Regions:
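Conserved alpha/beta enzyme-core scaffold
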Residues: 1-395
Length: 395
């Protein structure tokens, strides 16, 4: 492991590489490194023609996060599980300045594990009979995950192959092939002198380990942004990425590059477990400023959210997933109403507690546990939840 500057990290990334970026909305993104990458491109027109891969959206719908890759010529293709946070990348795709692909978020996290394990890819039913399905001859709405004409042209030319339809044991599946990762950009809290990385001040650890393993076993490099380098870690449990996977460590050079989330410099509630009753948890969450203001005006958004709370009360589910957008505040409203008897989960990894909203979405105040994002999607895909409250553009 070698400690380098953000500028030195940016200089390592070569044109044509596939770069995987870890993070989740406003948390866990290596902001200092990606900002330096963008500055290098604007200064030198390098690196060019990158393929950017990320599972959860990472950004503030403005300039931060993976939006740093949103320059014409810098990025050739984008493969992401969520685009709303990455408005600059969306503009590139919609103006045909890059290939754009929208693949299932959970599948992408599982692909990191498959790549790490030397497996050919991920075989799943996730994405069947949706726009991710590549069988355009069956339905004109199927596009293999392509979000623009440039991506569809790449599929037709055989230069892009992110998903295939296959028959397996007499049933139909989608197969997502493994691919090489040349560089993984991850963020943790601290590194020791051997490169072992802790996450004790991070809201969650999403796909850090799987991504680092995937890049390392692809023959690529792993660049980790941290707050500090220490002689040793206080506890073994804090270490989430072992140093054998880490090539370079970058110490954050500006406070704004290592916020806990893009909305909060630090929130102790996201890393502290709480096992009390719902009413008490709601009070703690209120202290942590994650509950909505009860005196706020009653608008259409709040009415929809309260209607979802009524479903929680009526259905009495045991395990619930809350999606991004309007659903993110449902847990806080439910706790505010004193409802209990259920456990809220977020795909980033938190289980229990009160999920945060906005640019802190993905975190949870006083969770009972936090697991890796790929493991959370194992649980979801296997049918582990009783109720999901999701955000949709149109139904």
């Amino acid at each position: 492991m070698k400690v380098i500057t953000t500028a030195q990290a940016a200089a390592l990334v070569q044109s044509g590489w596939t770069v995987a970026s870890a993070g989740f909305v406003g948390a866990g993104h290596a902001e200092g490194v990606t900002e330096a990458l963008e500055q290098r491109f604007l200064r030198e027109a390098l690196p060019r023609d990158l393929t950017l891969v990320y599972s959860a959206g990472q950004g503030d719908r403005g300039a931060r996060g993976v939006n740093h890759f949103g320059n014409v010529g810098m990025t050739r293709a984008v493969v992401g599980g969520h685009w709303r946070s990455a408005t600059r990348l969306a503009t590139l795709a919609m103006t045909e300045q890059c290939e754009g692909f929208n693949l299932p978020q959970g599948v992408l996290t599982h692909l990191y594990r498959a790549i790490a394990g030397g497996k050919p890819g991920v075989l799943t039913k996730i994405g069947l009979h949706t726009f991710v399905d590549p069988r355009v001859e069956k339905d004109a709405r199927y596009h293999g995950g392509a979000v623009n004409q440039r991506a569809r042209d790449a599929i037709a030319a055989g230069t892009a192959n992110w998903v295939e339809a296959v028959d397996f044991r007499g049933d139909e599946y989608l197969f997502y092939p493994s691919f090489r990762i040349d560089c993984a950009l991850i963020r943790c809290t601290a590194s020791d002198t051997r490169g072992n990385l802790s996450t004790h001040r991070e809201a969650f650890h999403h796909e850090l380990l799987a991504m680092a393993q995937a890049a390392h076993n692809s023959g690529g490099i792993v660049i980790a942004q941290v707050e500090s380098v220490v002689d040793y870690h206080e506890t073994l449990q804090a270490i989430h990425v072992p140093g054998i996977l880490v090539d370079y460590v970058v110490v954050s050079e500006q406070p704004g590059h290592h916020l806990m989330t893009f909305a909060e410099a630090y929130n102790e509630a996201y890393v502290r477990p709480w096992r009390g009753e719902a009413a008490e948890a709601a009070e703690r969450a209120k202290e942590a400023e994650v509950l909505p203001d009860a005196s706020a005006p009653l608008d259409a958004r709040t009415i929809v959210q309260r209607r979802a709370v009524m479903e929680l009360a009526a259905r009495k589910p045991r395990v619930v997933n809350l999606g991004v957008g309007m659903p993110a505040a449902v847990g806080a409203l439910a706790h505010q109403a004193g409802l209990g008897g259920f456990t809220l989960t977020v795909e980033a990894g938190p289980i229990g507690g009160t999920p945060a909203d906005g640019l802190s979405f993905g975190a949870s105040a006083y969770p009972e546990a936090v697991v890796d994002q790929p493991a959370q999607f194992d649980f979801y895909e296997g049918g582990g939840i009783d109720l999901a409250i999701l955000g949709l553009a149109e139904l």
